[in-house]
Design a protein with these regions (language model features):
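Solvent-exposed, low-complexity, repeat-rich "mucin-like" stalks and linkers
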Residues: 1-2, 61-100, 180-210
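Extracellular interdomain linker/stem segments of modular secreted and single-pass surface proteins
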Residues: 56-63, 171-178
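Solvent-exposed strand-loop boundary residues in beta-sheet-rich modules
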Residues: 45-47, 97, 160-162, 209
């Protein structure tokens, strides 16, 4: 006899003749609330019927998120995706102590296709009956003017305290060094003048030619 699927439950076989064991199995479930299906075993003809209730246990509350995300040296926007079955999600940031990436938590994120405030209750509680997708977008990230990767860690916390992290890394910028004067003319007394250096690297001054050129005045 062929199996039969009703709702989230599969019965194998879905029908029979006389005494027989029926295997009852269900789909994998990610909702936080136990679900129930009512079925009837009955004669193909006639009024003989027996009711059965199939309960499926709730899944544990959870939250998952992309473990890493990257931003180009030029800056811009990065989107981080995840899944959960929680009633609310709260986002926070921990910048790297040595080379921090400056980003701000947006006012809202997308949960099950709806704009949701950070830490706010998610509309219609989609996690009660299954997992849902969420995403958060960080925009207007400035260009990296340093020669180091910049890092910030995003933490998302579910209502039950479960957490997941994303390490956001911005690629190192290009090294540069500029000076505001290419020529300095000192007077005979050697009176000090200034060259201003604009750089994002460590630098030093070395002699560019093998010997000094002296002009002999006659």
């Amino acid at each position: 006899m062929a199996e039969m699927k009703i709702g989230f439950v599969t019965f194998n076989p879905g029908s029979g003749d006389g005494d027989q064991a029926v295997t009852v199995s269900g789909e994998k479930y990610k909702g936080r609330v136990r679900r129930t299906l009512q079925v009837e075993f009955g004669a193909e003809s006639g009024d003989v019927k027996k009711a059965a209730t199939i309960n499926q246990a709730a899944a544990a509350e959870f939250v998952k998120i992309d473990p890493t995300a990257s931003v180009g040296k030029e800056g811009g926007t990065v989107t981080i995706n995840g899944t959960s079955n929680s009633t609310k999600l709260t986002f926070s940031l921990t910048p790297d102590k040595t080379h921090p990436l400056t980003v701000e938590i947006p006012a809202s994120y997308q949960a099950a296709g709806k704009a949701t405030s950070n830490g706010g209750v998610i509309a219609d509680d989609p996690g009660a009956t299954g997992d849902f997708a969420f995403s958060i977008v960080f925009s207007d990230i400035a260009a990296n003017a340093t020669i180091n990767d910049l890092v910030n860690t995003l933490k998302v916390t579910a209502a039950g305290g479960q957490t997941a992290n994303t390490v956001i890394t911005q690629t190192a910028g290009d090294p540069f060094l500029e000076i505001d004067k290419a020529v300095i003319n000192l007077d005979a007394n050697g009176t000090p003048q200034t060259i201003n250096v604009n750089a994002n690297i460590r630098w030093t001054i070395t002699q560019a030619v093998s010997k000094l050129v002296r002009t002999i005045m006659k």
